Every structure is written in C-alpha cells, then in structure tokens.
Design a protein with these regions (language model features):
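Helical segment within the ABC ATPase nucleotide-binding domain
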Residues: 172-186
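ABC ATPase signature
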Residues: 91, 136, 149-150
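Conserved ABC transporter NBD signature motif
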Residues: 56-64, 76, 110-115, 218
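ABC-type ATPase nucleotide-binding domains, specifically the catalytic core motifs of the NBD
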Residues: 12, 30, 93-110, 121-123, ...
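A short, proline-enriched helix->beta-strand linker immediately N-terminal to the Walker B motif
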Residues: 151-155
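The feature captures the beta-strand-to-loop junction immediately N-terminal to the Walker
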Residues: 33-35
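Helix-to-loop junction immediately C-terminal to a conserved catalytic motif
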Residues: 48
C-alpha cells in the first residue's frame, strides 16, 4: 500500500533521513521506534509532503507521491495526527471535529453521521462537544485529535508520539483505540512512538531508526525479545 524507498531528507544542510526505506501493507500496524532526533517525525513529514526528500521515492497505492503537496496527499486518504495534538484551542470540540472533514465537502447529514460515530467511540467528547478544545485535559485533547483524523474517513492514518505527556491509564485507552481503528475499520496504521514496549505490543512489524538510518526491521514480537532492542528501548 505504501512504499518509502531509500529516501534522504534534509533540513537545510542537516540530513535527517539517510536512504531510509519502510513499507506498510494492507491492514497492518507498523511502528517506528528510535531515540529523539532519530528521524521518526521526519519520516512522517516526508510522507505527508510537509518536507520533500532530496532523493528516493514514496509510492502510495502504486502512485509516486514523493513531490505532491500536502493537500494532494490528504485528498488521497492519508491522515497525519501530529505530535502535540495541535487542536484548535478556541474552537469547540465539535468545530474541531468538523475541521477534520473540511476537505471532504460532506452533506450535513453525512457530517452528523460521522460526528455521532466519533461520539460513540469517545463519549467524553460528546459530553464536552460545545466546550472550547483548549480547556480539555491532555488525554481528551489526544482523543479529539484522533477523532478529528477519523472524520475524513482515512485510507491510512499516521500517529506521531500519541502517548506523549499522557497518564498511563489514558495511554492504555488510546492504544486500544488505535488497535480498534485498524481491526474494525481495516485502516493501515503507521505509529511513531517512544513507548517502544507498547508500540511493539500492538504492531505487526517495526522499524528501528538511528541517526536517520533504518538499523533494524522485522516482526514486532520477535524484535521485542531481542537483546539489543531490550537494552536500547525497553529498559532491559
């Protein structure tokens, strides 16, 4: 479904990715782990057209999307839930959700149906639907960011550090939601996450990024048992 082939991405003269390659198949959860500054977020930004690789290609459903603009990539069904949640703080919860469907030009009836679908998944958002998003807790804002991403009915969704700054009980709930999106909606997921243990636990495959290079990849359950992974990322 998605193939990133040997991309090298720079910020000015600083190289963030060095001939990095990943693949995501139909109905997979694929995680990317690595230390801060390893290039994980740059991989997602490259896929979304927020920064363009200097070399290499990105192919989605057989189409070369390497140099497309972000709005063109969004129109193809790829959704990015960035690090830090980035809700619109002055808008209400419901207005934030509607912004997620802005590019789709849905009818009023379709919009209401999608809103109710998200409210069924996140009852707390329904309770707070008229409340300014900036007044929500960190966990509620993260759930809002995920729900907003789902409003456009994505064909693939990418999460960048979704557990950052959240209480453990909220983290567990959030990962359950990500699993259900993949399982129930059959939507492929790319998960960038510093909580490597959790990421390896819910994904089928994983890539390890170090200094912009893919150093290791494979079955997540097998990687979780490897000494090098335990030592570097799992506290063992």
């Amino acid at each position: 479904m998605l193939k990133v082939d040997q991309i090298s991405t720079f910020y000015g003269k600083v190289q963030a990715l060095d001939r990095a390659s990943i693949e995501v198949g139909e109905n997979e959860i694929v995680c990317i782990i690595g230390a801060n500054g390893a290039g994980k977020s740059t991989m997602m930004r490259s896929i979304m057209g927020l920064v363009h690789p200097k070399s290499g290609t990105i192919t989605y459903q057989g189409e070369n999307i390497t140099n497309l603009k972000t709005n063109q990539i969004v129109s193809r069904g790829i959704v990015y839930v960035p690090e830090g949640r980035e809700v619109f703080p002055e808008l209400s919860v419901e207005e934030n959700l509607e912004m997620g469907a802005f590019s789709r030009k849905y009818t009023a009836a379709k919009m209401r149906s999608l809103l109710e679908e998200q409210y069924a998944v996140y009852p707390r958002l329904k309770e707070r639907r008229k409340q300014a998003a900036g007044t929500l807790s960190g966990g509620e804002q993260q759930m809002l960011a995920i729900a907003r991403g789902m409003m456009s009915e994505p064909k693939m969704i990418m999460f960048d550090e979704p557990s950052l700054g959240l209480a453990p009980v909220i983290v567990d709930e959030m990962f359950d939601v990500i699993v259900s999106i993949n399982r129930d909606k059959h939507i492929p997921v790319i998960l960038v996450e510093q909580n490597a243990y959790a990421a390896l636990g819910i994904s089928q495959r994983c890539y390890v990024l170090e200094n912009g290079e893919i150093k290791m990849s494979g079955n997540s359950a097998e990687l979780r048992e490897m000494h090098e992974i335990k030592k570097a990322y799992l506290g063992g």
